[in-house]
């Protein structure tokens, strides 16, 4: 064998495997618990220095200069990818829409907040065809501003300024989206293994949770109709389900569709079989670009993207009422695009309602509508809304501006996270507003006094700890919703969630409110404590007392400043999606699910931004603190409950215990003395996974060691403090 074919470092030949190749553990054991999602986006994959703070860099940005550069780019048509109608606005709007539009309310994942459209699988979804060109067109802008402007912000900003450059007044823009540097491993996009497959339905047409899109690789619905069948009324049902799961009501949905489709065109000339592979599958010389078409030049008027062909309006680069005007002015006839996709054409169209050819303004061509577009007229709910918008252009413009702002900011959390000079002043209900602090905050002396009152109140350690956990653990790192700030645990719908044990919660909250009122009334100055702060402080006091009982004195850091939201500031329907279907930290399962309890624990831990060690120490600590749902004994592996010991780990790892399932589903278990057969403990899958899974057992062994008690307490306190403050963005 030639020495030229041998690696000078490893000695391997060209045909040999390399590091990282071969069969992975998950190939051998596909049901293995997926813990890697807890350790994403570390400094090991991030090229930015540790001290880098995007908020500070964005603050140095001149948005007016960025806007000017983007305006220039919009009409600077490039030969390698010419602009339709001489304006890239439609392309950038689609890029922005598809970046933000992956958001779903079920778990808060997706959306445009991380710049994830740059990575697989999104960069290669069929619905994102040729958006690689949009991002490549933006590279000179990104290159110019570098670390001051993230890709995530730029992809949203480009769509906003595209709208403005074509005559539309947007609602505003908030920056602050921080880029990720690797694909997200936590987002479930579906079980399908082929593009555009739809094995996500059960029953008549029940879409699997938490998914929102109807097919693998689509952002929303199939524009040709459900399963490619051109039925506008049936399409309306799909649209309502999908947009609803993306946090949009019927009026917002119509505004988004009608407003967004006022601009740009679809591309569907030539044979789809002539389109090359997506970016992730393209050859190396394509340099990250995909979908190279062999039809003619493959660009301009010979572009192939969705397979649909044509513009929606006679003037696709200006804001007007053209979309709704065409929708209601004409009857529509089913036809097929040159690429063979179902679409609709207007009958007896007038000359003035023809659109210019995208790359030859001397030619006039018919407009089109998709099956999904016709749902805006034919659906019994969407139809009247569309008609009202058509008859009231100002109302339509305002609705689209607000819906577009919601689309592009829904995953960013509260308004306090928005950056820049274009943030609108108005508070919006979907931003989960909380009041500003309007009083002097308590200090160390008052904090110590309140802890004494809380511990002397008659409330138990489990009551104090479980209430604080219930309040804070609603937080989702995905869309930055939930958390203890606002004290919404006392409001609908949270006060009535089964997992929060409403009867017990009511008693605890009444006692906490008494303490709060008595304390505030006794203050001669302006100091006050909010119920939100007191709930968290009560949990901290309970943890500290439990640690003291175990022989370790600790003080949990406490920073006041939370405020109490009102019911009027709380959208009950919107908050309903935050209800835990399972909370392994409290050993709670609402019902039996197709996924295991331990998988749901890892999922919730990821939403809480916890690492595997943090998840492990929290479960072990909360078990001995006796905060299980319904005070269940499962996993309470201690004879000293309400004492913060490492007993959970010591007894879990005790080989003197033999475990047997109590149910045929293997979801509850009994541990008996291996010699005598005497019962010792009961447990759930969430408890036993820390002894069964090799990675979690390795962590459990750290905390189960004879000299681990102090480390266990301090690690528990650190993880507890993290959860209590997840929504305190102002502290970051």
Curated annotation (Swiss-Prot):
It comes from the Bacteria. Its EC number is 1.11.1.21. Heme b binds at residue 261. PROSITE patterns: PEROXIDASE_1, PEROXIDASE_2, PEROXIDASE_4. It is an enzyme of class 1 (oxidoreductase). Homodimer or homotetramer. This is Catalase-peroxidase. It comes from Chlorobium phaeobacteroides (strain BS1). The gene is katG.
């Amino acid at each position: 064998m030639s020495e030229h074919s041998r690696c000078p470092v490893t000695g391997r030949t060209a045909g040999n495997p390399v590091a990282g190749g071969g069969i992975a553990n998950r190939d051998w054991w596909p049901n293995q618990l997926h813990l890697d999602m807890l350790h994403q986006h570390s400094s090991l994959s991030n090229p930015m220095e540790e001290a880098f703070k995007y908020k500070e860099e964005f603050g140095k940005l001149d948005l007016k200069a960025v806007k000017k550069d983007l305006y220039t780019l919009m009409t600077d048509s490039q030969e390698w990818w010419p602009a339709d109608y001489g304006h890239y606005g439609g392309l950038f709007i689609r890029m922005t829409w598809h970046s933000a539009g992956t958001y779903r309310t079920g778990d808060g994942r997706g959306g445009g907040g991380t710049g994830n459209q740059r990575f697989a699988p999104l960069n290669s979804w069929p619905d994102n065809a040729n958006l690689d060109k949009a991002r490549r067109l933006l590279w000179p802008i990104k290159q110019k501003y570098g670390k001051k402007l993230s890709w995530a912000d730029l992809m949203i900003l480009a769509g906003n300024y595209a709208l403005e450059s074509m005559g539309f007044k947007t609602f505003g823009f908030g920056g602050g989206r921080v880029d990720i540097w690797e694909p997200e491993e936590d987002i479930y996009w579906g079980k399908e293994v082929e593009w555009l497959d739809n094995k996500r339905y059960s029953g008549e047409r029940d879409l699997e949770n938490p998914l929102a899109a109807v097919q693998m690789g689509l952002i929303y619905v199939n524009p040709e109709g459900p399963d490619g069948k051109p039925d506008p009324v049936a399409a309306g049902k799909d649209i309502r389900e999908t947009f609803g799961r993306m946090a949009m009501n019927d009026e917002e949905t119509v505004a988004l569709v009608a407003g967004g489709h006022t601009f740009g065109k679809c591309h569907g000339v030539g044979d789809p079989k002539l389109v090359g592979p997506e970016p992730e599958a393209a050859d190396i010389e394509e340099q990250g670009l995909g979908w190279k078409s062999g039809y003619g030049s493959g660009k301009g008027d010979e572009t192939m993207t969705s397979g649909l062909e044509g513009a929606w309006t006679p003037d696709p680069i200006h804001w007007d009422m053209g979309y709704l005007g065409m929708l209601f002015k004409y009857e529509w006839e089913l036809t097929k695009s040159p690429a063979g996709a179902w679409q609709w054409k207007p009958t007896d169209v007038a000359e003035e309602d023809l659109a210019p050819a995208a790359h030859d303004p001397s030619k006039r061509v018919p407009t089109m509508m998709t099956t999904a577009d016709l749902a805006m007229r034919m659906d019994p709910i969407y139809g009247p809304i569309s008609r009202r918008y058509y008859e009231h252009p100002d109302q339509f413009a305002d609705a689209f501006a607000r819906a577009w702002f919601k689309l592009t900011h829904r995953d960013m959390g509260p308004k306090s996270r928005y950056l820049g000079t274009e943030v609108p002043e108005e508070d919006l209900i979907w931003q989960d507003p909380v009041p500003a602090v309007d009083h002097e905050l308590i200090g160390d002396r008052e904090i110590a006094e309140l802890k004494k009152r809380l511990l002397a109140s008659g409330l138990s350690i489990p009551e104090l700890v479980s209430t604080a956990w219930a309040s804070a653990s609603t937080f989702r790192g995905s869309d930055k919703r939930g958390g203890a700030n606002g004290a919404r645990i006392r409001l609908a719908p949270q006060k009535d969630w089964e997992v929060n044990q409403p009867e017990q919660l009511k008693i605890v909250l009444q006692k906490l409110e008494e303490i709060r009122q008595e304390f505030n009334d006794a203050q001669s100055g302006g100091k006050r404590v909010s119920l939100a702060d007191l709930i968290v402080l009560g949990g901290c006091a309970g943890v500290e007392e439990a640690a003291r009982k175990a022989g370790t004195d600790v003080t949990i850091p406490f920073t006041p400043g939370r405020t109490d939201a009102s019911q009027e500031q709380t959208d009950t329907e919107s908050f309903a999606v935050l209800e835990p279907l399972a909370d392994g930290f409290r050993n709670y399962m609402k019902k039996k699910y197709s996924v295991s309890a331990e998988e749901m624990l890892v999922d919730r831990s990821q939403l809480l931004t916890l690492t595997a060690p943090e998840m492990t120490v929290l479960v072990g600590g909360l078990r001995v603190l006796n905060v299980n749902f319904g005070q269940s004994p499962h996993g309470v592996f201690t004879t000293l409950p309400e004492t913060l010991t490492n007993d959970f780990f010591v007894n879990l790892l005790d080989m003197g215990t033999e475990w047997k399932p109590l149910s045929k589903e293997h979801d509850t278990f009994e541990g008996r003395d291996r010699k005598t057969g005497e019962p010792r403990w009961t447990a759930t899958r969430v408890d036993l996974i820390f002894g069964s899974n090799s990675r979690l057992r390795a962590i459990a062994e750290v905390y189960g060691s004879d000299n681990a008690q102090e480390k266990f307490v301090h690690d528990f306190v650190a993880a507890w403090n993290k959860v209590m403050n997840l929504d305190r963005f102002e502290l970051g």
